[in-house]
């Protein structure tokens, strides 16, 4: 492995980008980052070869390109930006595009005919396999997987199914923050601004202009941090959706088990009634006027039941008893909530860290203080009087100012002073 810096990216972009997006990159024998290396420069002698991960630029879902100057199903005019391509001889470095189109992730593989099945197994694609005769000996093929690619973690059949409903919308929102959809990528705009500010900063000799450029860089970094915070908020909403769905499933399981128990009880009682000796019914049938006496008893039982029901309704309609029932229900629900909130029954590891004002381990739902320097950081919902996660920022009782959404002015001032002195 050789660790290099890609020559096709500006210094500012190399500083900010990740390892596979323009920064110092580990590749096998070539001086390009994974994002720019669209070809594994392998000839018939197999000098380079091997398999490397990369990000390929091109429209999503392009069709194969074979021996033509244009894509079959995409808008680009260069074979370098197609989903599949083969080429001989390899293009020069200057022909490799940097950016443009939509991004997919894929895997480059040598494809000699004797081993094409192995290459297909290692680099699985959601496309129909092509015959190895389509490609010449020693050529390569690039596979573009649109969307999310778990690099080195199994084939496309192992991927999770698409989520439905609100969870799908949250996934799409997180994806839009990263790569956009029908618009410029937010992080690309930030990188462009950083690049321009860096170039102007390096050319400037005036101290005031240099400070202005530094402020521009600071604003761009703040924007990137806001994008990261927004993604974290989306992920927390997704976690909340999953937890709500889990609670719904648990409640449905409890109802299903209760219905099963009721059904089993009713079946046992019916079986016991069927096993009664039939002699009693035969003896009653042999008695004279048994039918008439049974009808009279049924009428009397119905009248008694209706009178008792009316009496119960009148008694239960008094406001005092209604109030007593309501208070009993509230007490029961409060005791149940306290039992659920208490972690006394949970096995506690002595080495586990403690949180919150109660200085106990983490359990149930917790919320984090938005003060980065908060000594406690995480709090139980029940300890800070929360029933659900509040919108926007939230500060703990030790860090808040006038309300829970504002930070204490003294703490905020000291925080700014420490940031300024760094």
UniProtKB/Swiss-Prot annotation:
Q: Residue ranges of region Disordered? A: 261-349
Which residue stretches belong to region PBR?
A: 405-422
Drop me one GO molecular function for this one: methylated histone binding
Q: Locate the site labelled Histone H3K4me3 binding.
A: 355, 366, 370, 378
Q: What is known of its domains?
A: The PHD-type zinc finger mediates the binding to H3K4me3. The polybasic region (PBR) is responsive to the binding to phosphoinositides (PtdInsPs), including phosphatidylinositol 5-phosphate (PtdIns(5)P).
Q: What does this protein do?
A: Cooperates with p53/TP53 in the negative regulatory pathway of cell growth by modulating p53-dependent transcriptional activation. Implicated as a tumor suppressor gene.
Its name, as the record gives it, is Inhibitor of growth protein 1
State the species of origin: Homo sapiens (Human)
């Amino acid at each position: 492995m050789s660790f290099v810096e890609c020559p096709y990216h500006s210094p500012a972009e190399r500083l900010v980008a990740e390892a596979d997006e323009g920064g110092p990159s580990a590749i096998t024998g070539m001086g390009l980052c994974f994002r720019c290396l669209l070809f594994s420069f392998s000839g018939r002698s197999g000098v380079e070869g091997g398999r490397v991960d990369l990000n390929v630029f091109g429209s999503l879902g392009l069709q194969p390109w074979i021996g033509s100057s244009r894509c079959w199903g995409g808008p680009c005019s260069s074979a370098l930006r197609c989903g599949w391509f083969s080429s001989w001889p390899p293009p020069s470095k200057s022909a490799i595009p940097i950016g443009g189109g939509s991004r997919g992730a894929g895997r480059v593989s040598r494809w000699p005919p004797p081993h094409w099945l192995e290459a297909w197994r290692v680099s699985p694609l959601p496309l129909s396999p092509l015959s190895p005769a389509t490609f010449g000996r020693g050529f390569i093929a690039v596979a573009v997987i649109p969307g999310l690619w778990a690099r080195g973690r199994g084939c496309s059949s192992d991927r999770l199914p698409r989520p439905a409903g609100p969870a799908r919308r949250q996934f799409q929102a997180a994806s839009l923050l990263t790569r956009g959809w029908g618009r410029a990528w937010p992080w690309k705009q930030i990188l462009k601004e950083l690049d321009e500010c860096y170039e102007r900063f390096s050319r400037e000799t005036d101290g005031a202009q240099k400070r202005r450029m530094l402020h521009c860089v600071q604003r761009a970094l703040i924007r990137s941090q806001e994008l990261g915070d927004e993604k974290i908020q989306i992920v927390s909403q997704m976690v909340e959706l999953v937890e709500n769905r889990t609670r719904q499933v648990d409640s449905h399981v409890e109802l299903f088990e209760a219905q099963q128990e009721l059904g089993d009880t009713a079946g046992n009682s019916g079986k016991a009634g069927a096993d009664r000796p039939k002699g009693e019914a035969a003896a009653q049938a042999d008695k004279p006027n048994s039918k008439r006496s049974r009808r009279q008893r049924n009428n009397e039982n119905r009248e008694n039941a209706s009178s008792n029901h009316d009496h119960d309704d009148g008694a239960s309609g008094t406001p005092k008893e209604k109030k007593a029932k309501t208070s009993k229900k509230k007490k029961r629900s409060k005791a149940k909530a306290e039992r659920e909130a208490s972690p006394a029954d949970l096995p506690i590891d002595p080495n586990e860290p403690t949180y919150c004002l109660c200085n106990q381990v983490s359990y149930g739902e917790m919320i984090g203080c938005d003060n980065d320097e908060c000594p406690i950081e995480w709090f139980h919902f029940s300890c800070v009087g929360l029933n659900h996660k509040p919108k926007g920022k939230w500060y703990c009782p030790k860090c808040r100012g006038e309300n829970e959404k504002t930070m204490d002015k003294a703490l905020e001032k000291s925080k700014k002073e420490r940031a300024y002195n760094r």
